[in-house]
Structures are given as C-alpha cells and as structure tokens.
Amino acid sequence: MAETSLLEAGASAASTAAALENLQVEASCSVCLEYLKEPVIIECGHNFCKACITRWWEDLERDFPCPVCRKTSRYRSLRPNRQLGSMVEIAKQLQTVKRKIRDESLCSQHHEPLSLFCYEDQEAVCLICAISHTHRAHTVVPMDDATQEYKEKLQKCLEPLEQKLQEITCCKASEERKPGELKRLVESRRQQILKEFEELHRRLDEEQQTLLSRLEEEEQDILQRLRENAAHLGDRRRDLAHLAAEVEGKCLQSGFEMLKDVKSTLEKCEKVKTMEVTSVSIELEKNFSHFPRQYFALRKILKQLIADVTLDPETAHPNLVLSEDRKSVKFVETRLRDLPDTPQRFTFYPCVLATEGFTSGRHYWEVEVGDKTHWAVGVCRDSVSRKGELTPLPETGYWRVRLWNGDKYAATTTPFTPLHIKVKPKRVGIFLDYEAGTLSFYNVTDRSHIYTFTDTFTEKLWPLFYPGIRAGRKNAAPLTIRPPTDWE
C-alpha cells in the first residue's frame, strides 16, 4: 500500500512537471523560441512576438503566411493578446519558482525531488529514500498530503491565536483609552474635593463667626454684671464709711450723748458682720466644648497629613542659628562662624528651608511665632534665586504670610493683601494641597482661617521660615516648628 502511494506521488509530481512544460511551450514564440514579448495573434489564431512576426513579414506586401501552419492572410492583421501576455508573466514566475524549488528540493544523497514526507523523522525525502532501509518501516506520505494535514492543524491553531490576538488588541485599545478616562476621573474627584473643602471652609467661617458672636455676647453679659456689682459695692462702701464715721463720732461723745442711741449703732455694726460681699466671676462658661463634632473630624484628617518638618542647615542664611534638633531658628546680628557659600544657601534673604520638599499630596505643619513682632512663613519653589537681593512674591516663587511692626499682617501678593486678624496668633498652621494648587494659613490660637493662596504648582515646594531681623527683645525669640495642638 505504501509503495502504491509512493508511486502515485511520483506520478503526480511527473504530471505537474509536464503541465508546467506545456505552459512554457504555449507561452513561447515559435519564431525566436523565447517567451513571448508583446504577444500578438494573427488571423489563423497563432501567437508570436510582435517584433518576430513583423520581421518575418518584412518584405511581403500581400499574402502573409503563418510561420507555423503556413496559412496565408491577405492583410497584415496583428491583434495584441493581452491575456496571453499575462500568462507569459505567470509562466516566467512559475519557471523561476520551479528552478528555485528544484535547487532547494532535491535530495542531497540521490539528487531526486523531495516529494515525500517522513512522519517519524519529520523531514522531506525522495522516492529512493522512502524505499531505502532507513525509511522503509516509517510512515511516509506524499508531500501534498502531509502539507494538507499540517495545514489543517495550523489552521486549527490559527483560530485561538486570532481570538487571543483580538483579545489583546481590544485590551490594548482599552488601556490606551484609560489615561483619558483617568484624567476625567481625577478632574472630577479634584473638583469634588475642592467643592467639599470650599463648603468646609464656609462652614468653618460661619461657625467661627457664631462662636465669636457668642463670645462677645458673653463678654457683654459679664461686663454688665461687673458694672452692676461695682455700683452695688460702691453703695455698700459708702454705707460702711458713714457707719464708721458714726462709730468714731460716738467714741468721742460724752457718756450721756454716747448712750443716747448706742444700741442702734451697735445693731448696725452687728448687721455688717453678716453682710455678704460678692464678686462676679469672669470665667467663660460658653467655651469651645460645644464645638461641632464634624470639625474634630477635620482635625483628625489634618493629623494624618502632618509633615515631619525639620530645618536644613545647608540652606540657612549665615546670620541664622538653628537648634540642635533643627526645629527652631533665630536671627543673630553677629555671625558665629563662617559658612561655605553653597548653591543651596540663602545669602541675602535671612531665611531657611526644610530638609524635605513636596511635589505632590497634602501636608500640614505648625509654627510657633509667640510674641514675635516680625516673621514670615510659607513655601517657595525649588528654582528660586537664593543669592543677592530678591522680592519674595508668588511671581518669583514665594507664597508667604508675614508680620512686621508687631501688628501688620499681610499675604505677600502683588500688591500685599492686608490681613485683619482679631486675635494675635501665637501659632500658625500651614496646609499645602499640591494637586489642588492651594496653600492655606490658619490661626491656631483661635482656630480661624487667615488666608489661602491659589496657584498652579509645577516644581518641588519647600517649607520656608523667616524669623525676622532682631528688633527688640520680643523678636529675639525663635520661630519653632511644633507638633500640631489638639482641638479635642
């Protein structure tokens, strides 16, 4: 059976070769015996190269014979055969392929076409190899059969591959859309956060005004009671002064005069012993113990955002002295030592930066300013000029709140924004929301909002501390970074 298949395969290969030979003959010119060039068909139906048949009939004026069948035609009739021209090109290509296949598909041992396939050795073999001792016991089939079988197997593999390719293509397209979707989600969340904090600020401001109004009402109530009690005590004081004068006068009288109404005087003195002298308490009964619980939650949120800020001596102006724990800074008129002029160090503006800057997120820290009369706190961007004279404004990379002359507060915008602060802050809270582009300042002393800068931050931001120049004993105190105080 195997030998029959091999013989059939050999016959099939021979038949294919014969068909190719016939195609080459049909595509050849009978005059030049080469492939037809610009094939034309004459009246008898035979085809020739246009140039060949033209030369063949060159000296004739009538009765033009066919070079093949010798049939003559009265006229020089040459009709282009474009379809045959296409077949000629195909024949040329097939000849090239045949030559290539012949060169590549010959058995290296027997120089016969590799027309069969051995399953066991997974290799192409020729007819002689197939009946040899090496492959006689193997399963050998015609190359076309093996090709068809493996083609079907490959096609079965192709479907899941195409499905997986489609899945990956869809997934990739989905992933490529996600940055835009993420941007929209982030912007939506950003607007939500801004809206929530705006509402929170509004409610805090309202609550602040309510509490301050209640505090003022309580102050007026206590002042009224103090005035009334002072008037009452004034009346008692006058009564007692009159009684004391009366007693002194009695003591100077003669016996008859003294005894005349001494009992009445003694009764008055006795009543004085039981007279109650009361004072008005100025203790504030209405305090922050009733502060709404939702704002304690805000404080808890801020606690989670507390930044561990320490001062960087490499940035400190030479006239600034830092504490050992790098939490405090103060100005000294005489430099204690010469410091290297590094690129990070400020040489004109007497300030110092923190050791850590921020390029994202939300961060909160507090600075104790005490009774100082001159200071500034805030942030600056990484690229600010640190040498020579400068103007610390948002346009130059500085966002600050400052105090000078003991009572003048301002946000250092262009121009300065005066800040009307009712209660002098002993401690200032600073809240940076990098993505939202906000930097907020709070008076920790009375828990009020001072000012908020709104900008677009594109660089690393560094916490900045300016203790002010030493102008009097009060401003000699340092600026100190403190852990945030509790509101609870």
UniProtKB/Swiss-Prot annotation:
The gene is Trim39. Zn(2+) binds at C107, H110, C129, H135. It comes from Rattus norvegicus. Pfam families: PRY, SPRY, zf-B_box, zf-C3HC4_4. This is E3 ubiquitin-protein ligase TRIM39. Residues 289-484 form the B30.2/SPRY domain. Residues 268-307, 359-488 are annotated as: Interaction with CDKN1A. Interacts with MOAP1. Interacts with CDKN1A. Keywords: Apoptosis, Coiled coil, Cytoplasm, Metal-binding, Mitochondrion, Nucleus, Transferase, Ubl conjugation, Ubl conjugation pathway, Zinc, Zinc-finger.
